[in-house]
Amino acid sequence: MRYALISKGLSLSQIETEARKAGAKGIKATRLLNQIFCDLNAEQAKALSLVSGLLVKPIKEYKTDQVETALPPVETFSDVSYLLRSYFTPPLTGTGLTVAVLDSGIRKSHEALRNKVVLEANFSDSPSVEDIFGHGTQVAFVVAGGLHSLGEKAGVSPGAAIMNLKVINDEGIGSDESIILGIDKVCDLAEAARKKGLWPTDEMYPNVINLSLGGEDDGDEDNPVREACRQASADYGIDVIAAAGNTGPKMTTVMLPACDPEVIAVGAVETTDELVIWEKSSRGPTVQGETKPDFVIWGTNLEMASHKNDEEYVAKSGTSFAAPMLSGLTGLLWESGRRAYGEGWLFRWTEARQFAPYFSTKPQDAPVKKDNAYGYGLPAMGTMLGQVSQVSVPTGDVTEVMNMFMMMTTMFGMLQGVV
């Protein structure tokens, strides 16, 4: 059976030594995250669990989840993103943002994704980085697909760069091991970029990890994927944004790793003229009692690039596509802030959460405080962009939901302190 050996005080070399002493086989080590993966029998696993400073956890499966839709795709996703970017001169495109998409691979030859992918690596048990299952291509499109052009099918930040780290195999299944090795690779790239003196805006400097995948929340704070996500955020300054899951409206259904306090969990609202939580969007609290998700954003009936050929598009729904929408929004916020305050200005959702009640909106009948359906609410994009860049974003020519995205609230200037 496959296990993860997690450091609780031991060095990576010490863990590997203990594993070899126990007779472990198929050893594979991370570079930075102090975890080792290996094959153990029950007796070997029990012996290693007695070693001080070491945790032994069986490897678990993770899956992507998406819902096919028979409805005509909603046009406003690309339209409102274009409108929002166009209120700035020159228009925002999310340039400078690099999102590591840990998923089922990406069809980088698709017309909407050409020249977007700057790095590829395969940690799944499938033979190539190609998207055979059909999920990662859609996620990448929502982040950075297309061009900033009127009528163009495009994602939120078409100027952003994408890293394709395949951690889900061609049947739609991944594991603790594949996901953690992917996270470790992203941290290694960030550390290498830092050592080279690269600006965080360099395309080889990953800023966000997008995890549109998950497994059942087991309540285990020491779960190896949760450990890896926390390290990526705390030690390497990378926002980890994850899909809440599609198993609502039941309570306590937010997936792992979205359930972790250090991970930004994203639920989905209907892509309509009303702010309504999508029925299948997973709800909190987590098994440990955390209020989740953190935010909600569009996630239903979205038209995205297909993995099947280079000109095809497909309409799907799911929190899998809400998460990359928030990842893409990072690029617009960060770019607008850099214009106002200089290249050294940074934006992280992890730190912005303390201001979330001031830049998010909910239906009138929803709780004012963070709740287990909407979280803090829907980020009002225009509000946030206006505040970080001191540009007034008009709202008169958009629908009710667009106004919710773009309305100005009372928090002017508070995000200037988010660094």
Which residue stretches match the model-derived regions?
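Short glycine-/aliphatic-rich beta-strand segments at the starts of folded cytosolic domains
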Residues: M1-K8
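Autoinhibitory propeptides
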Residues: G9-D79, Y87
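N-terminal domain-start motif of subtilase-like serine proteases
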Residues: K28, N41-Q44, D65-V101, A121-I132, ...
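Subtilisin-like serine protease catalytic core
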Residues: F88-L119, P127-S178, D202-N207, D235, ...
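Extracellular S/T/G-rich loop segment that most often corresponds to the catalytic His/Ser-adjacent loop
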Residues: D103, E111, M255-R338, T383
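Hydrolase catalytic cores
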Residues: V142-V143, M163, V167-N169, T253, ...
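Substrate-binding/access-modulating region of protease and related hydrolase catalytic domains
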Residues: V167-E262, G289-E290, N309-A323, K370, ...
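C-terminal subdomain of the subtilisin-like protease fold in secreted/lumenal serine endopeptidases
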Residues: K196-L211, E335-V418
